[in-house]
């Protein structure tokens, strides 16, 4: 048997009824709002706008998602829409208020056009790039030229001279120079930390240079008496050393050092004498060998003859 299914009708969406007068009112309201944007109003409070620019108390509501209807229903419900009632007071505002808004908008636009954007260095955090302690770059920098390194890095972060404070219509006249003060503070702090390091290093090197004691200069009489004492005995210790130092007007340590140096000099002299004697002996032996060779050659010549 042939079965016939009943014809089911689907709901058809119809466009919302919109009048041309409501569209005109909406366009006029949008044009009025674009002519006087809220961004150019000095204050964001709506209390200042209520005397001259009152807004509508009712907000239009449009139901874009109607409730579903049964599939076999042929009656399409109409969506009620409240017409938008324009507020004529927006277009008939007080002339003084409109003039004030226009002046504020013109001042804001002219300031943005004449003033350049703030440099990135005034908003960024200043970071001094100092090489690490163990790196080879740090070895090339001593404490004395740390100031030069800091000034080179800060010169790259400072704005050019054309954007320095004092120029008309510049960003730095309206915004306090917080970035410049921060950079100056960082420079002062870095220099305050680098100067003591340089002073400490200089003092340390000066102490190392002064650590070596001055050489004692002995007088002629002192040297002669010490030489006479050294010829008699090469080692002077104990009470004898103290008595000798007291007699010569020296300290026991000075006497001890003089004898040490004199013994070293004596040993070097002995070594030089030994070397010289060995060289003389070798030269004498070589001379004797040559004479013997000459005599043997003469004897050989006589035998041949």
Swiss-Prot record:
The keyword Nucleus applies. PROSITE patterns: HOMEOBOX_1 (PS00027), HOMEOBOX_2 (PS50071). Probable transcription factor. Required for differentiation of AIY interneurons, acting downstream of LIM/homeobox protein ttx-3. Modulates gene expression, acting downstream of AMP kinase aak-2/AMPK signaling. Modulates lifespan. It holds the Pfam family Homeodomain. Gene3D superfamilies: Homeodomain-like (1.10.10.60). Residues 287-305 have a biased composition (Acidic residues). Residues 113-140, 262-305 are annotated as: Disordered. The gene is ceh-23. Disruption phenotype: Viable and display no obvious neuroanatomical, morphological or locomotory abnormalities. Lifespan reduced in an isp-1 or nuo-6 mutant background and extends lifespan in the short-lived gas-1 and mev-1 mutants. Expression of the G protein-coupled receptor sra-11 is normal in AIY neurons at the larval L1 stage, but drastically reduced in adults. RNAi-mediated knockdown reduces lifespan in various mitochondrial mutant backgrounds, including isp-1;ctb-1, or clk-1. InterPro entries: EMX-VAX-Noto_Homeobox_TFs, HD, Homeobox_CS, Homeodomain-like_sf, HTH_motif. CDD domains: homeodomain. It is found in: Nucleus. One of its GO terms (molecular function) is RNA polymerase II cis-regulatory region sequence-specific DNA binding. This is Homeobox protein ceh-23. Residues 211-270 bind DNA. Transmembrane segments: none annotated. Keywords: Developmental protein, DNA-binding, Homeobox, Neurogenesis, Nucleus, Transcription, Transcription regulation. Residues 120-135 have a biased composition (Polar residues). Belongs to the distal-less homeobox family. GO terms for biological process: cell differentiation; determination of adult lifespan; negative regulation of gene expression; neuron differentiation; positive regulation of gene expression; positive regulation of transcription by RNA polymerase II; regulation of transcription by RNA polymerase II. GO terms for cellular component: nucleus. The keyword Transcription applies. Its main location: nucleus.
